[in-house]
A protein has these predicted regions:
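Carbohydrate-interacting regions of secretory-pathway proteins
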Residues: 20-295
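Signal peptide processing junction and immediate N-terminal pro/mature segment
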Residues: 4-22
């Protein structure tokens, strides 16, 4: 039989010893040792095998200065994604978040800029018809653009006269905005079209009163000594549906014959005033490197 001694005291009496009987272990069974706390260990830093960091003797990649799994190839920078698919990532530039039009202007004669006359209502950017198109104050070349737009319910008209607007990259290359839900028009002029050049692969437009979502990837044309060495390309996703798959542009879009002319590597993005009260929200942009093939 094992016993333990404990001490009790009160404010009026000194400490007194009390004998406490403990349970008697079964015959032939040794008593359990007292439990001891084990001090926690610091986590051991994981050692990564050197071959997991890349190779130095692997075959070269055709057309690139790197080898397969090249140990010395630069690793991508870290970008924090948005909390939702439509939220801007950490490296995005906010063009409109419902708070104001500081990123935009109208263009006047002789390249003069003036204050936007479009409206901000309910955290939305609203076209004020016949006040002129809006332009970003900053210039952009190759980029990823996220933009949400809506044709207000009850918008009247037909064909190109119903819910018409557009997004022009470098003021030259237009992705069409139009109410294309049960509204017939020419194929390369409906929503999702690269205006005048490519119809969308499918018509993915929602009815009036619902928000439409564009995610557009634009590769700017490149010139060397005024010679075109790479044309422009556009990839367009409308409402989660791929409608333009890395299309090579024949030149600036529009009704005229497309012809490339040397210009600056970057220019403003334009939102078109076509006389219809289109609504926009949540516009952000990411600048993309001009050439990613060797990264």
């Amino acid at each position: 039989v094992f016993a333990a001694v404990s001490w009790t005291s009160t404010s009026a009496t000194p400490l007194q010893a009390q004998q406490v009987e403990l349970a008697t272990p079964e015959d032939g069974e040794p008593p359990s040792p007292p439990e001891r706390s084990v001090p926690s260990r610091r986590p051991v830093k994981e050692k990564i095998p050197i071959h997991h960091l890349g190779a130095t003797d692997s075959p070269p990649l055709p057309g690139q200065p790197w080898k397969i799994h090249d140990r010395y190839r630069p690793r991508p920078k870290v970008v924090q994604p948005g909390e939702t698919p439509d939220a801007p990532p950490s490296d995005a530039t906010i063009l409109f978040d419902g708070q104001g039009l500081d990123a935009w202007c109208h263009h006047g004669e002789e390249d003069l800029w003036y204050v936007p006359m479009w409206l901000v209502e309910d955290d939305q950017l609203v076209v004020e018809p016949h006040t002129g198109s809006l332009y970003t104050i900053d210039s952009f070349g190759s980029c990823q653009l996220h933009l949400e737009w809506m044709i207000p319910e009850g918008t009247k008209g037909n064909s190109q006269g119903r819910g018409n607007s557009g997004i022009k990259f470098m003021e030259l290359f237009e992705v069409q905005i139009l109410d294309s839900f049960s509204n017939r028009t020419y194929a390369d002029g409906q929503a999702g079209a690269i205006y005048g050049q490519y119809p969308p692969l499918v018509n993915a437009v929602k009815p009036q009163g619902q928000w439409q979502v564009y995610d557009i990837f634009f590769e700017a044309p490149r010139f060397e000594q005024e010679e075109l060495v790479r044309p422009a390309y556009l990839t367009v996703v409308l409402n989660g549906v791929l409608v333009q798959n890395h299309r090579q542009l024949a030149g600036p879009t529009g009704a005229r014959a497309p012809v490339y002319r040397p210009g600056t590597p970057a220019a403003p993005i334009m939102l078109q005033d076509h006389g219809n009260r289109i609504r926009f929200r949540n516009i952000w942009i990411r600048e993309l490197p001009e050439d990613t093939s060797h990264r």
